[in-house]
Amino acid sequence: MTAIDVMWVGLGGGIGSLLRWWIGLSIGKVYKGNFPLGTFLINISGAFVIGYLSILFSVDWRDRYGDLMNTAVLTGILGGYTTFSSMQLDAAKLATARGRAIAAGYLIISVLVGLAAAAFGAWLAY
C-alpha cells in the first residue's frame, strides 16, 4: 500500500458516499413507505456493479490500468457507496418499531438479493 493508494481509496470513498447520500435523498423524496428502500436499492445496485466490475478488472483491465481501477473504484467508490452499517441501523429501527420478524426478513432479503445481484453482475461480465 502506497500513499497514492490511500489517496485513490479516500477520493473514491468520498465520491461513493456522496452518491449514496444523493441517491438515498432522491429515493426518500419519492418513496414514503416504512421499508428502507433507499439503503436496500443502494446495496443491491452496488453488489451488482461490484460483481460486474470485479470480473472486468481481474480479466481485462488489470494489464492496462494495474491496481488503480480496483483500488479507486471497487474499494473506494463502491466501498463508500454501499453501506453495511446503514443496513444494520435500518434493521434495528425496524425491530423496535415493527418487530423482529420484519427486521430479520429485511436482513435476509438484503443479503440474498445482494448475493444474487453480485453473481448476476459477474455472470454478465463473462
UniProtKB/Swiss-Prot annotation:
GO cellular component: plasma membrane
Keywords, ordered alphabetically: Cell inner membrane, Cell membrane, Ion channel, Ion transport, Membrane, Metal-binding, Sodium, Transmembrane, Transmembrane helix, Transport
UniProt-listed Pfam families: CRCB
GO molecular function: fluoride channel activity; fluoride transmembrane transporter activity; metal ion binding
Residues that bind Na(+): G79, T82
Main location (coarse class): membrane
Catalytic activity: fluoride(in) = fluoride(out)
Membrane topology label: Multi-pass membrane protein
Transmembrane annotation, as ranges: 7-27, 37-57, 68-87, 101-121
Family: Belongs to the fluoride channel Fluc/FEX (TC 1.A.43) family.
Protein name as it appears in the record: Fluoride-specific ion channel FluC 3
